[in-house]
Amino acid sequence: MSRTYQTLGIVVKGMAFGESDRLVTIFSPEYGLIRAIAPGARKPKSSLRGRTELFVVNQFLLFAGKSLDRINQAETQYSYPGLGQNVCNLAAGQYLIELILALGTEASAQTSLYELFTEHLRRLETEATVENIYGHLAQALFHCLGAEGIAPQFHHCAITAQTISPNFYDRQWRVGFSPELGGIVDLRSSRDMGPIPQMRRLTAMELSLLQQLNQPALPDPQQYLPVIARKNFRLWDWVKAENLMRYYAQRQLGKSFRAAVLLDSMWEVDF
């Protein structure tokens, strides 16, 4: 059986290896995460030099080794050049890479996750602005977690399974959110259970935004919010939605996202 194989993949991690090689992690729809050596990739004239940088999508020809595979050829398909033109978008892209490294598995197909990851990179490159970048990230987190079956539930109570809709007519209205229970909680039903650790309280605006994350594209709040709520929407509400998704993802995956902290500091300066 041949130990040479081909796959489409995107470079999600890279580091120096030996005198002139590069050790890269490739995310492939067919094989998940692949760790491979790019021989001579750090030499100035190497054809693999630019093709093994982060975010570069290649058609790879690889040789399967015992512990590390080896890149024989790489033909670039796309490289998301727009991400590098804005430091916030670049940090956001690196944030999604950290998510994929946490969700990805070796030697198993993850086609849906790959397609969502590359689609959300495209949106960061072409659609994201300083005003909506946190909304795009919140939706990317939701979609990617959903591809692996661990997205939070924002429409039904995690205890009673009853549908919960945001109440914009009562300013004091709140709904709970518990990472341990996997979603939102009707505060009235939670009284019978006693204290729920790490539970947060969400406003009607926050719940409304979170309930829209399952849509294919990022919705415009001014298009779906009731009239009474439209004037109260602020860009900061998308930040809070992303922060909740980040909090949930980090608890589910047991990892923190360093690029997200970097994005926070740069976004505050830009905005």
From Swiss-Prot:
The keyword DNA repair applies. SUPFAM superfamilies: ArfGap/RecO-like zinc finger, Nucleic acid-binding proteins. Belongs to the RecO family. It comes from Synechocystis sp. (strain ATCC 27184 / PCC 6803 / Kazusa). It comes from the Bacteria. This is DNA repair protein RecO. One of its GO terms (biological process) is double-strand break repair. PANTHER family: DNA REPAIR PROTEIN RECO. Pfam families: RecO_C (PF02565), RecO_N (PF11967). The keyword Transport does not apply. Involved in DNA repair and RecF pathway recombination. InterPro entries: ARFGAP/RecO, DNA_rep/recomb_RecO_N, NA-bd_OB-fold, RecO, RecO_C. Keywords: DNA damage, DNA recombination, DNA repair. The gene is recO. One of its GO terms (cellular component) is bacterial nucleoid.
